[in-house]
Design a protein with these regions (language model features):
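Short, low-complexity N-terminal leaders and the immediately following helix N-cap/first helix
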Residues: 1-78, 329-355
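Helix-rich terminal scaffold detector
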Residues: 1-16, 180-304, 308-314
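Short, glycine/charged-enriched hinge/interface segments at domain edges or termini
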Residues: 2-14, 66-233, 365, 369, ...
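Generic structural signal for well-ordered, non-membrane alpha-helical segments
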Residues: 12, 16-20, 33, 37, ...
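Flexible glycine/proline-rich
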Residues: 20, 33-38, 42, 47, ...
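Predominant activation on well-ordered alpha-helical scaffold segments within soluble catalytic domains
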Residues: 20, 24, 64, 124-125, ...
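Structural signal for hydrophobic packing residues in well-ordered secondary-structure cores
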Residues: 24-31, 48, 70, 114, ...
Length: 411
């Protein structure tokens, strides 16, 4: 049964773990596309990449020098050099096509194919060439300075696993085995409906009657960081306008910012209930207690609080998980975690998770702000956040805590 909380308040707040479990159980339809390597950085590999070739495909010189038979160098020294005849040259892309016999050598450059008959490469500093005569001044063991076929990658090797967020060097590896394109997950489309008659778009100077939107730019950057494509639309604080926007939504998931709390103009929860399913409204989380989520048909919809820090918190813990799952990424937070010691206590209450902005300096964790859902500047001053679990009443000064770092992301 739908409970209209406007001007009444919440009867129950869902546990954070309960909401996370619901998000992670949402069905995900995996859409894939083939993209050229030039466009693949940062995309998520949909299928494992298996090499069909050895890399290198041929024995190649690891040094500049001469390709020859190692046996012809045994016993050579500075005071007792051996002499061989140079019968050709092997260059990268222009190999020597003959066979190296006993007493012969081929001038060779790094990366060039080692010709048939040769089994070692004598370093340039270990020989002297005059005309076609090579003076060998040090022995070169069989196999020395020769890169063998497949020493980098063997045919049949899985070089990149499915689910990998592609890095620049991954694209180089793909190219080295002959791939010009890769099959990746499609980037999920996220429609963000920003509500609030008091809001004006980015680039507009705020004044006594309006507020420049902060949630739209923040969410766009977060969504794109997590592999999605964001479309931002501004919707008046009118039920009919929001209803039309929800009914016409063409996206893989829908976010509504603002209009999710207990005010008279907070229409989003009621409309989500009427148009689909309102799974949760109200979470035991500070500062994102008014958050909600549900379904529009088969698509997830997230009601994110209008206060900027609450919006960021609800994205970090809930909505972002779904964006990442839709795009084939790991659902868990992308923030790298560190540990430090609290410089002062953090107070909380049982039954609620607290998202606390903190600075981390040389292992010391300093709370920036434990409340103030509208103070977005606190997140720019912070290095990250800590989460106080629902079964804690806070942490004392000196406690060891885990920090989620805003600027450090795992791939």
């Amino acid at each position: 049964m739908f409970h209209d909380v406007r001007m009444r308040g919440f009867k129950r707040r869902a546990d954070v773990d309960e909401v996370v479990a619901w998000v992670d159980a949402l069905p995900v339809v995996e859409a894939t596309a083939s993209v050229p390597l030039a466009d693949a950085r940062g995309r998520v590999l949909a299928t494992a990449l298996v090499s069909g070739v050895d890399v290198p495909a041929f024995a190649r010189a690891a040094m500049d020098g001469w390709a020859l038979q190692g046996e012809d160098t045994f016993g050579a020294g500075e005071t007792d050099p051996l002499t061989l005849t140079v019968v050709g040259t092997s260059l990268p892309g222009a190999p020597h096509d003959g066979v190296v016999g006993r007493g012969q050598a081929i001038r060779i450059m790094t990366g060039a194919p080692v010709p048939a008959g040769a089994d070692t490469v004598l370093r340039a500093e270990d020989g002297r060439q005059e005309g076609d005569q090579l003076s060998v001044r040090a022995p070169s063991a069989i196999g020395r300075h020769v890169g063998q076929p497949g020493e980098d990658i063997h045919a049949g090797t899985t070089v990149l696993p499915a689910g990998r967020v592609l890095r620049p060097q991954d694209l180089g590896v793909a190219s080295s085995i002959g791939q010009g394109a890769l099959v990746v997950h499609e980037r999920p489309r996220v429609l963000v409906l920003v509500t609030g008659d008091e809001l004006v778009p980015p680039g507009t100077m705020p004044d006594a009657s309006c507020i420049a939107d902060a949630n739209g730019p923040t969410l766009r950057a977060l969504i794109e960081r997590d592999g999605g494509r964001a479309e931002i639309r501004y919707v008046p604080d009118e039920a009919d306008a929001l209803r039309a926007a929800l009914e016409g939504a063409e996206a893989d998931t829908v976010f509504v910012t603002g209009g999710s709390s207990v005010g008279e103009e907070d229409h989003a929860p009621r409309l989500l209930h009427e148009l689909g399913t309102l799974a949760f409204h109200g979470v035991g989380l500070r500062p994102a207690a008014p958050a909600g989520m549900g379904l529009l048909g088969t698509r997830a919809a997230f009601l994110l609080p209008g206060n900027p820090v609450s919006c960021l918190c609800a994205y970090d813990l809930f909505a972002g998980r779904h964006v990442r799952r839709l795009g084939g990424r790991v659902a868990a937070s992308p923030y790298v975690r560190a540990h430090g010691t609290l410089t002062r206590k953090i107070a909380s209450v049982l039954g609620r998770v607290d998202y606390v902005r903190v600075r981390l300096t040389a292992g010391r964790v300093d709370p920036v702000m434990t409340s103030g859902a509208s103070i977005l500047s606190s997140t720019t001053e912070a290095d990250g956040y800590v989460l106080v679990p629902r079964d804690h009443e806070g942490w004392r000064e000196g406690s060891e805590v885990e920090v989620f770092l805003y600027d450090a992301l795992r791939s």
